[in-house]
A protein has these predicted regions:
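Generic preference for hydrophobic
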Residues: 3, 26-27, 50, 75, ...
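Beta-alpha-beta core module
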Residues: 11-17, 21-23, 83-130
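Short helix-loop capping/hinge motifs at secondary-structure junctions, enriched
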Residues: 31-41, 58, 117-119, 130-136
Length: 148
């Protein structure tokens, strides 16, 4: 089982849409000039050194939010794992476009600021198609279905 962030290509997976969402925003140092803002808008991102996910679906999602070409942004690095991007942010290398609940900023030098207008994504529980489940996995899936 895994948790997938929409949009997702489900051609290889079965899934259950979860009743939860997460929102996009910017991970930055607490002393960054944008850290005092409550929200980050598209204009705020112009010319900033950005660290972005290297997934094409993410780029498409953010292009729609920007109402502009994603390639016009000043992308200085890409990431597969947000933890690695958070290390770059902590070193002052840029600002990471990411989801809210992936990096714990409590007691750290980093903070998260949501995008405005708000950009939310759905979450799905996914598993390989035609999967034969163990008793424990089968029980887990039935319990998730029961709870949602």
């Amino acid at each position: 089982f895994g948790i997938s962030i929409e949009p997702t290509n489900f051609s290889k997976y079965d899934f259950i849409k979860l009743p939860y969402t997460d929102c996009w925003g910017v991970l930055m140092k607490k002393d960054a000039f944008l850290a005092s803002k409550e929200y980050i808008n598209p204009q705020d991102l112009k010319d900033l050194p950005l660290i972005c996910s290297n997934q094409d679906l993410v780029r498409n999602e953010l292009s729609g939010w920007l109402k502009d070409d994603f390639d016009k942004l000043n992308i200085v690095a890409t990431y597969n794992l947000i933890y690695n991007a958070s290390l770059l942010v902590d070193e002052g290398s840029g600002y990471a476009l990411t989801l809210d609940k992936l990096i714990n900023t409590y007691n750290s030098t980093l903070c998260f600021k949501p995008l405005e207008p708000k950009l939310e994504v759905g979450l799905d529980l996914v598993w390989k198609k035609y999967q034969i489940f163990s008793k424990a996995a089968d029980f887990f899936l039935k319990k998730v279905i029961e709870l949602i």
